[in-house]
Amino acid sequence: MVTKPSHNLRREHKWLKETATLQEDKDFVFQAIQKHIANKRPKTNSPPTTPSKDECGPGTTNFITSIPASGPTNTATKQHEVMQTLSNDTEWLSYTATSNQYADVPMVDIPASTSVVSNPRTPNGSKTHNFNTFRPHMASSLVENDSSRNLGSRNNNKSVIDNSSIGKQLENDIKLEVIRLQGSLIMALKEQSKLLLQKCSIIESTSLSEDAKRLQLSRDIRPQLSNMSIRIDSLEKEIIKAKKDGMSKDQSKGRSQVSSQDDNIISSILPSPLEYNTSSRNSNLTSTTATTVTKALAITGAKQNITNNTGKNSNNDSNNDDLIQVLDDEDDIDCDPPVILKEGAPHSPAFPHLHMTSEEQDELTRRRNMRSREPVNYRIPDRDDPFDYVMGKSLRDDYPDVEREEDELTMEAEDDAHSSYMTTRDEEKEENELLNQSDFDFVVNDDLDPTQDTDYHDNMDVSANIQESSQEGDTRSTITLSQNKNVQVILSSPTAQSVPSNGQNQIGVEHIDLLEDDLEKDAILDDSMSFSFGRQHMPMSHSDLELIDSEKENEDFEEDNNNNGIEYLSDSDLERFDEERENRTQVADIQELDNDLKIITERKLTGDNEHPPPSWSPKIKREKSSVSQKDEEDDFDDDFSLSDIVSKSNLSSKTNGPTYPWSDEVLYRLHEVFKLPGFRPNQLEAVNATLQGKDVFVLMPTGGGKSLCYQLPAVVKSGKTHGTTIVISPLISLMQDQVEHLLNKNIKASMFSSRGTAEQRRQTFNLFINGLLDLVYISPEMISASEQCKRAISRLYADGKLARIVVDEAHCVSNWGHDFRPDYKELKFFKREYPDIPMIALTATASEQVRMDIIHNLELKEPVFLKQSFNRTNLYYEVNKKTKNTIFEICDAVKSRFKNQTGIIYCHSKKSCEQTSAQMQRNGIKCAYYHAGMEPDERLSVQKAWQADEIQVICATVAFGMGIDKPDVRFVYHFTVPRTLEGYYQETGRAGRDGNYSYCITYFSFRDIRTMQTMIQKDKNLDRENKEKHLNKLQQVMAYCDNVTDCRRKLVLSYFNEDFDSKLCHKNCDNCRNSANVINEERDVTEPAKKIVKLVESIQNERVTIIYCQDVFKGSRSSKIVQANHDTLEEHGIGKSMQKSEIERIFFHLITIRVLQEYSIMNNSGFASSYVKVGPNAKKLLTGKMEIKMQFTISAPNSRPSTSSSFQANEDNIPVIAQKSTTIGGNVAANPPRFISAKEHLRSYTYGGSTMGSSHPITLKNTSDLRSTQELNNLRMTYERLRELSLNLGNRMVPPVGNFMPDSILKKMAAILPMNDSAFATLGTVEDKYRRRFKYFKATIADLSKKRSSEDHEKYDTILNDEFVNRAAASSNGIAQSTGTKSKFFGANLNEAKENEQIINQIRQSQLPKNTTSSKSGTRSISKSSKKSANGRRGFRNYRGHYRGRK
């Protein structure tokens, strides 16, 4: 009796199906046997006899357990036993049947199929056929008499044997074909494996560039892989087809055998050799011939399989139970454990249903039915189902009208192979489709808390909304990740109400709102959005900077500092390495602000239905300011250049680039709103790209005009995207400056911050969520910490009022950047939530590593990359050795050389800032300090006082200066070396943004380097990888400072991958200027260069940095080098006799001439790392086709020219400038660059002791009374420009002179602007040396003359503009331009202009900070405020850090 499977619905279902089929098969076989025996033999009563072993032949096996030979009386009480075996690959079914009714019938011999196993031989050597024997128990004599019939049955079954031979041949052919196809498949897989390995080697190669890798992969590897995949698929299909053909032929063969052999019915099928062990030779039971049999009969439709089992194991008892295994008709697919039917008692019939009554059969059927269960709806709802569709058990009861797919399908119609709702526990692990509680939670039921999404839902028909959404779709609400194309996230609109908009961003479809908790944290979403990088090991770069962990060494270090009489850096200054950034200084305030905004959101968003926003949308506001209403804010550092001034008519006609629908409006806004005559390089390209909806990466030097790239598109309404521009800015002080500047231009700009009253924040937030602002400045901490801010942005996006996202100072995104901010990495939120909104990333400092990080972390999509030269020609770079008198040298220079001029002194820590500021105050200099440890209001007051010239010098950490709007900074001192070359460029770039000559002076000390190393190594917030990164960057700074030979400008620009010819420096750095005072010699470094190339070539595949290679070449035995066995290289230690600076110079030169090459790779942390490899010119060097020679200093000057004596008057010196000026980009090289101030008046600068530095207003002979105020201002500006040029030219002379052109001549030149030598001669008696020097002023005079003529035209334009403005106030038909025609950019609705004016006034009240105090009070509050020191004490400190008591 078959045991019914339990706790398994699928098994139970299959078992029922198999049982029904099996009973039919049994009926068919039994009837055929009955008919055959009844017709062939008479009934006799003979005792059963067991044949001898010799009769059966040597190939027999004791297999079937029969009735012992105890005579006819014993057999008369036995029931029929019929043995039949149904076989598949691993399962067999056996039945044994005997009948006392046919005990006298002799045996019937049926020849077996012999397609696989050859026939065994008789003892005589003759070949005989094996037969499957059906032998009822009979007398031995009858068996002996019929033995001849057994052997003679060969002729009677000749046709069957022939058919078997044909089947054998067909089956062998099919198997050979399958084997051949499988061999071909194996070879194809091997070829595919080789191609994949080759692909991996190309990807991991360090000797190939990225372009070369892509070319090889696309040209060689990918086509072959594609062809190989097609070939493998084809072979797999052929193998499957061949197997199916063989199976079908076996089935037809089996059917033909059964149908054509009435006299040769197969009565027994042997079990598989794997399932059965042969009996012993001493067995007295009936034996049957062990031959191969068909794997399955035609009844089951299985494949034919021939096996042979020879009796070798004779130790098993013949009384072993027979196993009858139920065949699973899908065993080829499901490797299920067999269901075993074990032979029961002797009275158990083989076919129980033939002997059962109807009642017994009904009882058996009831016992075998599937267990009853309630009807359950397993179907997942789709788009056509109603919203109230519910999965679960109550579908029929609660929703009788819903038609189920299961009702249309019968159990037999279901394919078990694809069944997904009845699985076992083992299958659950593989398919994860077992029904569990999460299936019932798939649909949000109505019993959820109705107030859970109050902020986002209105009282509308939810089901109708979702049905509408499912029909129309919302392309804006579905994000398809580029990393995983199958992951889609449906975002929600913060409001259910759809505001109509004509913009691209608006689609009138209601959004499906997800639960708030799911939006805040979704594990599946996080996993799908995260990038996966290989966990391969990358050898990290090594620095030769020694570890300073010894306390004794630190004590000796401090003792040396004290002996020198100056307070150097010490461990007391150790703090978190990046603490000076303004990181998360407002987190607590942001949390409080977020709570306030939540209240605002609840009031505003829930009341939108009652008080909908006005139907009008903000259009272009009417500008009331005229050209004459320029204020001193026009010198904003990023969007004005005096040298670019041309007439407006010329600008409007000069459009060489492509034109767009918004081009006219862009030019109009540029002139009328920003009061600018034209664009700087790359500005127009950036504006057009973002108005097209593209992502943009803008890389411009400081003062290059980055802000205009997003401020101008913010006021242009005709682009593809329009609305509110969100600007992510790192510093609150920077945001305040930007907002104040934009409000002065009547641009609706505001900022989110925790400052101000709750009412002011409420007003700003209401303007923001309604899309009434052009620009909104938000800090990255606000984006990551405030959920209300994110919801407001989501509402803007849903309403089609989100124009673009701007990331200012984007280098903060990169871990390689000098101002890394962790919250910046969260800004990828924008491209994931709003993928179709364009993004702009702007920065002034970005190496190749930083650029890769920015694009990767912000997830920019094919950004338009705009880059220009980083060369700041008006900056003078100088590096001096730091001594104990350095602070006094700085004080003397500020009081003499930089008298009445503002500047910055950068220090490395808060303590150093306070000490330096106190020392300068004691020397009579108006100075204050600025660092991140101060209160925000204190920092703001110091910054405002410095910008208003109430403070001359500000001592600050790196927390100060980012985006500072002060163009006339004349000097930047680094009292301590900067931490990175990026930071050095950024901080020095804050000088001379008006284009005038400025100085960048750095003081260098190895003790400062060692102290900063200690700060990095002891920073607990940095892991080992980041510590090495910072140490490597610090070593680059050290190499830059210690280099006294190469051009400073070339060294800085090479860091940004920009090639620069040092001849173009024109002695604008200390190394180029001092080159005349040192003795250099030329050395041939070809041989060391070859050794370096061989060294790099031998270890470049291990991803080594250039600093690591320098250490190996120098002979370092650091732990990394020893562990990597690089100390055994032939090139190790070859350069031990050379100085470290010389080795660094050689490596740097090899990279410059492309013998070596640096490349960047994204590491496991998601940041780019730079490594070195041989370059394209390495082969020329190794083959002797290239020689390398370099200049080395053999006698460096003992002391550099003192900065205090740089301006000694020397009238007889001729400037060392080429007599034939070289033109670069249209400018004379001797002249300063064209980045100059926008102010109409610059202060007078006096240099110590010089008589030329008068600060009183300029008066011209007998003409001042006849000139207007505007003309006088122009004269003063012209004089200052010429005077500044004279100072710059004097600085370039060797030695420098302080009176390159006398003041009296400069004043006359400012009045008449002579264009040639003859006009210059009319100035009066002029010495010959000044006539020779006049040629250096010609280009500047031509520029000034052009500007003066354009201002004369603007004077008349101003009168016309004023007239039309007055006329517009009295007319309601619009405003006319100066040409008399109506501007298409002005709206006819004057109410709109009034509303815009009200919005700007409201912003001013809520955003503008209070005015700073007067000069005296401001200075007094700064200089005398008692700050809390680093040790917690209050009071004044002298420079050495000692506290003085109050008097």
Swiss-Prot record:
Q: Which residues form the Helicase ATP-binding domain?
A: 687-864
Pfam families reported in the protein's UniProt record: DEAD, Helicase_C, Helicase_Sgs1, RecQ_Zn_bind, RQC
Manner of cofactor binding, per the entry note: DNA helicase activity on G-quadruplex substrates requires Mg(2+).
GO MF term set = 3'-5' DNA helicase activity; ATP binding; ATP hydrolysis activity; DNA binding; DNA helicase activity; DNA topoisomerase binding; four-way junction helicase activity
In what way is its activity controlled? Helicase activity on G-quadruplex DNA is inhibited by ATP-gamma-S.
Which of UniProt's keywords are assigned here?
ATP-binding, DNA-binding, Helicase, Hydrolase, Isomerase, Nucleotide-binding, Nucleus
SMART domains reported in the protein's UniProt record: DEXDc, HELICc, HRDC, RQC
Please report the stretch or stretches of sequence annotated as the Helicase C-terminal domain: 886-1035
- Which residues lie in Low complexity bias regions? 1412-1424
Determine the domain of life of the protein's source.
Answer: Eukaryota
PROSITE patterns recorded for this chain?
A: DEAH_ATP_HELICASE (PS00690), HELICASE_ATP_BIND_1 (PS51192), HELICASE_CTER (PS51194), HRDC (PS50967)
Domain HRDC residue range list: 1272-1351
Ranges of biased composition (kind: Basic and acidic residues): 243-253, 363-386, 601-611
Bias (Acidic residues) ranges: 403-415, 552-561
As annotated in the record, motif DEAH box runs over: 808-811
One cellular component term from this protein's GO annotations in UniProt: chromosome
Q: Which portions of the chain have biased composition (kind: Polar residues)?
A: 59-78, 254-264, 1402-1411
Q: Output compositional bias ranges, type Basic residues.
A: 1425-1447
GO BP, sorted A to Z: chromosome organization; DNA double-strand break processing; DNA repair; DNA replication; DNA topological change; double-strand break repair via homologous recombination; gene conversion at mating-type locus; meiotic chromosome segregation
Gene3D superfamilies in alphabetical order: HRDC domain, P-loop containing nucleotide triphosphate hydrolases, Winged helix-like DNA-binding domain superfamily/Winged helix DNA-binding domain
Enzyme Commission code(s) on record: 5.6.2.4
UniProt-listed InterPro entries: DEAD/DEAH_box_helicase_dom (IPR011545), DNA/RNA_helicase_DEAH_CS (IPR002464), DNA_helicase_ATP-dep_RecQ (IPR004589), Helicase_ATP-bd (IPR014001), Helicase_C-like (IPR001650), Helicase_Sgs1 (IPR022758), HRDC-like_sf (IPR010997), HRDC_dom (IPR002121)
Q: Where can this protein be found? A: Nucleus, Nucleolus
Oligomeric and partner information = Heterodimer with TOP3. Forms a complex with TOP3 and RMI1. Forms a ternary complex with a MLH1-MLH3 heterodimer (MutLbeta) during meiosis. Interacts with TOP2.
Question: What protein family does this chain belong to?
Answer: Belongs to the helicase family. RecQ subfamily.
In its UniProt entry, what is this protein called? ATP-dependent helicase SGS1
- Source organism per entry reads Saccharomyces cerevisiae (strain ATCC 204508 / S288c)
Source species taxonomy: Eukaryota, Fungi, Dikarya, Ascomycota, Saccharomycotina
Gene name in the database record:
SGS1
